Amino acid sequence: YREIFPASKLPSGVPARNNVKILTENFRWFFSEYDYTWEDIIKATKMYVNEYRDKQYMYMQNSQYFISKQDKHKVKTSKLADYCDMIKDGVTTEEDHFKEKVI
């Protein structure tokens, strides 16, 4: 999972890859809340990172916050769960119909 994220800092200045111990704690929470497989998680993570690659990772969450992030009201949310749902629903991020052909 961690290796899918770029081995550099994001434009926000934070490392894209977080410490393994922090990720382990976040995944414990994730698996207690959601019923996804590691295969779903890897596919969803690759989809997420690939979406941001062309934008030089601008506004992308780091590996910890992608699993779970707590808002100011102490509510935990998971963008990873959203992307796992998209994988389960067969959603792709390829938007070829919006790309312009240049000849």
Question: Residues of each region from the PLM?
Answer:
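Append "and, occasionally, other polyanion-binding protein interfaces
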Residues: Y1-I103
